[in-house]
A protein has these predicted regions:
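Active-site metal-binding loops of divalent metal-dependent hydrolases
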Residues: 11, 137, 281
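Conserved beta-alpha-beta core of the PfkB/ribokinase-like small-molecule kinase fold
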Residues: 131-228, 234, 251-253
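Conserved N-terminal subdomain of the carbohydrate kinase-like
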Residues: 26-28, 50-134, 158, 327-333
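Glycine-rich phosphate/adenosyl-contacting loop at the front of the ribokinase-like
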Residues: 1-60, 65-72, 76, 271-273
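Structural detector of well-ordered beta-strand residues that form the stable sheet scaffold
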Residues: 6, 56, 162-163, 189, ...
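Short, conserved phosphate/pyrophosphate- and ester-handling motifs at nucleotide-, phospho-/glycolipid
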Residues: 48, 191, 279
Length: 333
């Protein structure tokens, strides 16, 4: 039986635009291809729906024009909102700049999604076949208390799958929060930059042991030098005691599962038009296929294909449909 994907992340509105280069302080530039679209965790849930799997959003949505756009978009895409509403605040928004090299820069506001009370996720009770997607961005807002309450409530008897996207915010969460996520043992899904940040946090925990500290510092240096390889990913997996996925762009993704050797699952090189949302696409397809019982290695391979197609299109929510992914893979999944 196929489950559903439940997001505990945040849905906001993306104001996207293209620029030749991100402006310097005091500079005035004109942008092109300006669009207003619902984004953040919506991009992940959109990818889930493109795979034909049910999706629910449990985050807080506010009251106001941004919130209205979010609710309408969720309804249009068949995504159920199972979270709380904030009658006082509007939802947040983000300005996303994509430069001529397809790199992106973000400026975000905090809206209702960031101010959830500690009981915000108390009504979320995933079933065994469900996949819960957690975003590191939630851990740096007040809604973190609700997320940590959910994690603690479900740790001991958790039967569902949890996928954690640490985001760059993993560098700023306090040690107790970091340890809580370590103890939860989700599937960690990150890019190379985030892998570096995770390694740095793990190395800091090893400071009390000179042997472990030396090894961890060597690994951190390898990752910082953009040398994500079998050894570094295996080390991350061992220290996290959980499956680890490290996305490496057109080269695909590294996967390490406790007890198995780390392996690189090849990507599908494409000419990138816009990398905005590629990671969200990867995560959504991964979660959707795990709901269907697809083995983790195969799910990562499909996610690689989907995100490769996604970067050939402009916009934050550009996940291809299932048939397009199957054509690229040359098989049905």
């Amino acid at each position: 039986m196929t489950g559903k994907v439940i997001s505990l992340g945040q849905v906001i509105v993306d104001l996207t635009m293209n620029v030749d280069a991100v402006p310097r302080a005091g500079e005035d530039v004109f942008a092109g291809n300006v669009q207003t679209q619902v984004g953040a965790s919506f991009n992940t849930l959109y990818a889930v729906r493109r795979m034909g799997v049910k999706a629910s959003h449990a985050g807080v949505i506010g009251t106001g024009p941004w919130a209205s756009q979010i609710l309408q978009t969720l309804e249009n895409r068949g995504i159920q909102h199972i979270g709380k509403r904030d009658a006082v605040r509007d939802s947040g928004f983000c300005v996303a700049l994509t430069d001529a090299n397809a790199e992106r820069t973000f400026i975000s506001t905090r809206g209702a999604e960031a101010y959830g009370s500690v009981d915000a996720f108390d009504s979320v009770n995933p079933e065994k076949q469900d996949v819960v997607h957690v975003s590191g961005y939630t851990l740096v807002h007040r809604t973190a208390d609700a997320l940590l309450a959910f994690v603690k409530r479900t740790t001991e008897h958790r039967e569902f799958t949890a996928v954690f996207d640490p985001s760059p915010m993993i560098a700023t969460v306090d040690d107790d929060v970091f340890r809580t996520m370590l103890a939860y043992r989700p599937i960690w899904s990150c890019n190379e930059c985030e892998a570096t940040l995770i390694a740095q946090r793990l190395a800091a925990l090893d400071n009390g042991n000179s042997c472990d500290c030396k090894v961890s510092q060597d690994i951190v240096q390898e990752i910082e030098n953009a040398n994500v390889n079998e050894e570094t990913v295996a080390w991350l997996c061992d220290r996290l005691r959980s499956p680890v996925i490290v996305r490496v762009g057109a080269d695909g993704a590294w996967l390490a599962i406790p007890g198995d050797e780390a392996l690189r699952i090849p990507g599908f090189p494409m000419k990138a038009v816009d990398t905005n949302g590629a990671g969200d696409c990867h995560a959504g397809v991964l979660c959707a296929l795990l709901c269907e019982g697809v083995p983790l290695e195969d799910a990562v391979r499909c996610a690689n294909a989907a995100s490769a197609l996604a970067v050939t299109r402009s916009g934050p929510a550009t996940c291809p449909d299932r048939k397009e992914v199957e054509r690229l893979l040359g098989r049905v999944f």
